[in-house]
Regions:
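Beta-strand/loop edge motif enriched in small/polar residues
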Residues: 1-260
Length: 260
């Protein structure tokens, strides 16, 4: 199943969204242009071809499996509900969110469970989290956006938005790859230093991380990318053909992510 969107079109969800494809036949959300900008670059590989998917405040649940969302202005925008730990669960599995001119995922006071998925290449941040409760397991979060040198990090975490406090109750990243072209692809900003009154809770376990190494008990058995590694950043992956805007995120056999 392929859903085609015109340049200013978007999907807004205020009830629930259930989209379940298969490995052989994923559900695809993309722009409607079938022509080429250049002989080796179809418009489908150019970001900003449509808007994206908005998960509204009244949404009661998202269940997406084997979905491919690509080449929009944003991927998934979660408006969120109240700043509590009881927000409706939004589940995404075995899916790709790729090549957005803005953020790949932007979540406000939401409850996300994302597993075995790829969130890559964004003109903004691949993932922007403002408060809420989140778990990412077996995910590749890669920032190799080709259309701007000013793109954001792969991952941005905060417990405030435009001066408004948004408690970050949980942000767990387990067996994930978080990398990109820059020297630091994980940025966190917290207001307040009291965990009870201003929660800013995160955990990284058994991940490959492109960020300066820190001593922190909430970073557990991770591999830190450094210049000592023969294979790092984009070389972790096979299938990158930038002139044709093709980005395959299958792991290279020499990647430091193998075995973590």
């Amino acid at each position: 199943v392929t859903l085609l969107f015109r340049s200013n079109a978007y999907m807004r969800i205020e009830g629930s969204l259930i989209a379940k494809g298969t490995l052989e036949a994923p559900i695809c959300f993309r722009g409607n242009r079938m022509d080429y900008m250049f002989p080796n670059q179809p418009y489908d590989r150019i970001s900003g071809q449509w808007q994206g998917i908005i998960i509204g405040r009244r949404c009661i649940g998202v269940d997406m499996d084997f979905c491919d969302i690509h080449s929009g202005s944003y991927g998934l925008f979660f408006e969120g509900t109240d700043a509590s730990e009881t927000s409706p669960l939004m589940t995404i599995r075995n899916s790709i969110i790729h090549n957005m001119s803005g953020h790949g995922i932007e979540a406000h006071n939401s409850h996300l469970h994302i597993g075995n998925s790829q969130i890559t290449n964004a003109g903004g941040n691949c993932i922007s989290i403002y408060g809420g409760k989140h778990e990412f397991i077996h995910c590749t979060i890669g920032q190799f956006y080709p259309f701007s040198a000013l793109s954001g990090p792969a991952l941005y975490l905060a417990n405030s938005y435009s001066g408004t406090f948004c408690p970050l109750y949980q942000a767990d990243f387990i067996n994930c790859i978080i990398t990109g072209y820059s020297d630091d692809d994980i940025i966190g900003e917290s207001i307040g230093d009291d965990d009870e009154t201003h929660p800013f809770r995160y955990r990284f376990s058994h991940c490959l991380l492109n960020t300066p190494e820190v001593v922190d008990p909430l970073f557990i058995n991770n591999v830190w990318e450094s210049k000592e590694h023969k294979v790092m950043h984009e070389n972790n992956f096979t299938g990158f053909i930038p002139p044709s805007l093709i980005y395959g995120f299958q792991l290279d056999s020499l990647s430091s992510a193998i075995g973590i």
